[in-house]
Curated annotation (Swiss-Prot):
Sequence ranges of Low complexity compositional bias: 600-617
NCBIfam families, sorted: PRK00290.1, prok_dnaK
Stored PROSITE patterns: HSP70_1, HSP70_2, HSP70_3
PTM sites of type Phosphothreonine: T201
Entry function: Acts as a chaperone.
Compositionally biased tracts (Basic and acidic residues): 574-592
Alphabetical list of Pfam families matching this protein: HSP70
Protein name: Chaperone protein DnaK
Domain of life: Bacteria
Organism of provenance: Chlamydia felis (strain Fe/C-56) (Chlamydophila felis)
Amino acid sequence: MSEHKKSSKIIGIDLGTTNSCVSVMEGGQAKVITSSEGTRTTPSIVAFKGSETLVGIPAKRQAVTNPEKTLASTKRFIGRKYSEVESEIKTVPYKVTSGSNGDAVFQVEGKQYTPEEIGAHILMKMKETAEAYLGETITEAVITVPAYFNDSQRASTKDAGRIAGLDVKRIIPEPTAAALAYGIDKAGDKKIAVFDLGGGTFDISILEIGDGVFEVLSTNGDTHLGGDDFDEVIIKWMIEEFQKQEGIDLGKDNMALQRLKDAAEKAKIELSGMSSTEINQPFITMDANGPKHLTLTLTRAHFEKLASNLIERTKAPCIKALADAKLSASDIDDVLLVGGMSRMPAVQEIVKDIFGKEPNKGVNPDEVVAIGAAIQGGVLGGEVKDVLLLDVIPLSLGIETLGGVMTPLVERNTTIPTQKKQIFSTAADNQPAVTIVVLQGERPMAKDNKEIGRFDLTDIPPAPRGHPQIEVTFDIDANGILHVSAKDAASGREQKIRIEASSGLKEDEIQRMIRDAEQNKEEDKKRREASDVRNEADSMIFRAEKAINDYKANIPESLVKEIEERVEKVRSALKEDASTEKIKEASEELSRHMQKIGEAMQSQSASAAPSSAANAQGGPNINTEDLKKHSFSTKPPAGNSTSASSNNENIEEADVEIVDKPND
């Protein structure tokens, strides 16, 4: 396959909990790119099946029969400690354990995978989708994250991009991306709220937009609330109902649980447009009396009752976001709905209650975030002019000071990029060193906030307590990722760190994963080529047998025998699971003999030409041009899988004509 030239495009990727989407700027417009499966979004699912790694739709298709090795909703674990994901672990069929640094990692067949690695597989799929469409190699991307993702989660998402072979030019919040897509062609000043209820997280952002400036005024949310939780209440209800009917607990059967998960997701979607839905799962389990079937009716009203607590949880973050923006609901001009769960009528109703107006349903909640990311990519690449994005940090950042107190340096909803400095001192006489503990959160005591990093400033000259002047600087870049430094004024000694996050990957781990991803890419390519060769060989057997059947009476018996022998050689090579090279050799040999059919037919046609009587007496009316086309198309691809695919298309067209024309 010829190498693509490097693209100047910066693609936009919405790396979602349930589905992912990729978009690119073309002719001044953001375009969502359709996947190789023909869909505009791709399931954020990775599965391991033997030596294969499946991503997207193929992974989703086999989830029911392979639940422990199918990793879905992994975004809920990225950048998090094992101790932080207790509720999420209960909802997935695969094994989640604690990694060497306490991070949540996935255990599949004795091997550990980090959420960053799994995210990288999905990002690679998005990258390949864009490359197939553009015909160019993509190296740069803007990736979106929930607005309420903390520093660890943002840094880990960026690491996933690096593992996927992408230079992540910017990490931007999903609601901000949605606002970009909505407001890029709007005139006048507006204050908007973006209500984003996705598969794994909930965000609310308040923005002011006008004259190409998109300023985030405040953001809030809940990273433990999303569509998965709505699925879970339906699953729990189905398990309870089935136990009442049959006395069997389906919650202990992983395969049944995966089927219930699929059924719950389908029912949830249907209830957005219908008042009730039938849930049918035949042969869901069996007991001593035989197979058992699950048949239930779920009404929209009952679903809303089951999910009422989840819906109610969206209210408080909205009220806080309005208060932080110093606005009332009446100040909001428009409310955008983003994320698949925003289609639920009860969710739309609570949005109407909070903001006092009908939400705007004019954007596609599944695609608008990727479109906004592509627009931001266009801004960074110089393709989109006169757009300025002013984002904020979602949570306060500070350090631990005397008495275990959290002292904020950067308050939540501060516009980024930003730099803040503050002078601190020692707590004891002649203190030689200080430990800077970096915290993120809103609680007054350090222990109640999330520690995202720590480092020591040593060799402080002896001095009474309170005398040393230690300047602590917090520098936050446009991605919302933090850099911290501490400098002793007396000695000039300075120590600084980029907060990699206490949850996150070290540089050597990232490099190893990049190498693994590249190696897997090569192995996947080899597997694909082997599959193409086998498919071509199988197809050639069919065409050879068909040609013999169609033209046996018009070609020498010796040639028929030779072709039949070559067919058996190819068939044996396939059955014996021979190497790709051996199958290719056998196929090429069969191809050479297949061409002799065309030559024999041409020769016979030429010798029969002087006599028209043959045709009058019922001789075969054969179009030799079709035979030429047929024999030429059977030549195996002289190279890679791309040409194999191309040849297959020609073969199918030729076959259609050959079947019809001898009977004309």
